[in-house]
Amino acid sequence: MKRRHWSHPSCGLLLLVAVFCLLLVFRCSQLRHSGDGAAAAAPDGGAGRNDGDDVDERLVELAAVDPAAMAVLQAAKRLLEGNLARAPERHRDVALRGLREWVGKQERFDPGVMSELVELIKRPIDRYNGDGGGGGEGEGRRYASCAVVGNSGILLAAEHGELIDGHELVVRLNNAPAGDGRYARHVGARTGLAFLNSNVLSQCAVPRRGACFCRAYGEGVPILTYMCNAAHFVEHAVCNNASSSSSGAADATAAAPVIVTDPRLDALCARIVKYYSLRRFARETGRPAEEWARRHEEGMFHYSSGMQAVVAAAGVCDRVSVFGFGKDASARHHYHTLQRRELDLHDYEAEYEFYRDLESRPEAIPFLRQRNSGFRLPPVSFYR
């Protein structure tokens, strides 16, 4: 019988097709494995990412875990059980009422709080100023422009004072000095809202004497305070005692209101900063984001006062300008103190990444994107 040779044209064609198929399978396998490697090496770990989406869903889940907030809430509940015994009797009822309301809002995470900040923050200020009680022109509107002035020593390297004072609302942090001849050309002279960490409030109020020395910018400047310790509702009651925030009418003799940030805003800020910190950890160490807690004191980790002030301003202003955020090797940590070292409980580098996104690509910020919060961020500019 005659032997069939493989040199026949049809056989050669079959062989070429077979080789092509093998190469195609090999190439697809390579692409799949290289894709896995790219995901593992991606800045935010790659896991849980949707096509065309910069947000890592696994990091979103991890950011929701907040032991520090849980510890504060548990301590608050114990204070309620003990009827806030540390409060002087004349301030106890007011302090307890504020604490109960605050605890009652703790259980719900709601990025939609951004759309309520005009009502929660600006409306009480308008009422105090006599602008928001009768359906006037200013009722319900946002501030046209806001300047948030941080405390970084880099402020002294520029002269932004006049630019800062040109904004409708000027927000300052933790009673940093302003307005005198030494700092005015750098930080401005006007203040429309003081943002205080409640630790600062606790240091300048004296409950036993019923005295409040926390109004560094004058009795007519409202205070917005974040409660980092539920016991500080006593100091809040003392400082808010003379304000007219509950009367609904302006009073020339009354001090401006002391407003407590809504716990939903606190939780939103905490998740945003932890997300950016987790992402930074995974990118810089190459380790799984789940190991983040080993490198940080998770029970102490917290966002900075400045970060929350910026987010709050984004909720009540049509345009936000930010000054004095950042660092330089030659500058002090705070422009008005000798402190040079940053606080370990904050991840400032992660916050700087958030600020860069806020300025240049706000759509990439988890929790604050319009589809998450129903809120559109205003333009935010950082002056350095």
Swiss-Prot record:
Its EC number is 2.4.99.-. Belongs to the glycosyltransferase 29 family. One of its GO terms (cellular component) is Golgi membrane. This is Sialyltransferase-like protein 3. The keyword Ribosomal protein does not apply. The gene is STLP3. It comes from Oryza sativa subsp. japonica (Rice). Keywords: Glycoprotein, Glycosyltransferase, Golgi apparatus, Membrane, Signal-anchor, Transferase, Transmembrane, Transmembrane helix. The keyword Glycosyltransferase applies.
